[in-house]
């Protein structure tokens, strides 16, 4: 992981209790590979998963839930290891990334790591309610599902809103200069 990455996530990396929960997966080659793929906007899949993992860990800890499973599964929930933007056009709806990637992430997570039942449930069901029949079994599964939606939205909408605000300000300045 690059120096820039380490600087960006310094607070998280220095959280010893969090790192103890994820130490066996955080620096693994499989998890590092997620940095090669864009998830939302300019955010890589690794950055997205770290954000989901850390926020879920903090909330789970506050709520006295299984924060270790939340942290680990949050980090692995999108371990699908492909560029989902390159999906072939014309695939039937059930083949779309949003519906299929949790299973691929779970397959990869099982391949590289030892998971408990709760972590498996979290990874497999994190796209609920999109995946209607995959209803989360644990509170931690619901938590990661909600944190994932929040994080995805902030990674997608906030940068667009900032750009829109910048363009709006530019327009106002140009308009104001006409009437000087």
Language model feature labels by segment:
Residues 1-180:
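Metal-dependent phosphohydrolase cores
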């Amino acid at each position: 992981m690059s120096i820039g990455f380490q600087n960006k996530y310094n607070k998280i990396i220095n959280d010893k209790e969090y790192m103890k929960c994820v130490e066996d997966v955080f620096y693994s080659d499989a998890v590092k590979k997620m940095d090669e793929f864009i998830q939302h906007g300019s955010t890589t899949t690794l950055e997205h998963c770290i954000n989901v993992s850390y926020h879920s860990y903090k909330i789970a800890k506050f709520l006295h839930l299984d924060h270790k499973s939340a942290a680990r599964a949050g980090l692995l929930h999108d371990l699908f290891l492909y560029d989902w933007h390159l999906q072939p056009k014309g695939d039937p709806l059930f083949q779309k990334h949003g519906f299929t990637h949790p299973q691929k992430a779970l397959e990869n997570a099982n391949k590289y790591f030892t998971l408990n039942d709760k972590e498996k449930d979290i990874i497999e069901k994190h796209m609920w309610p999109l995946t209607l029949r995959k209803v989360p079994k644990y509170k931690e599964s619901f938590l990661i599902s909600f944190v994932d939606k929040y994080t995805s939205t902030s990674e997608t909408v906030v940068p667009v809103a900032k750009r829109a605000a910048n363009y709006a300000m530019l327009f106002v300045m140009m308009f104001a200069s006409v009437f000087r």
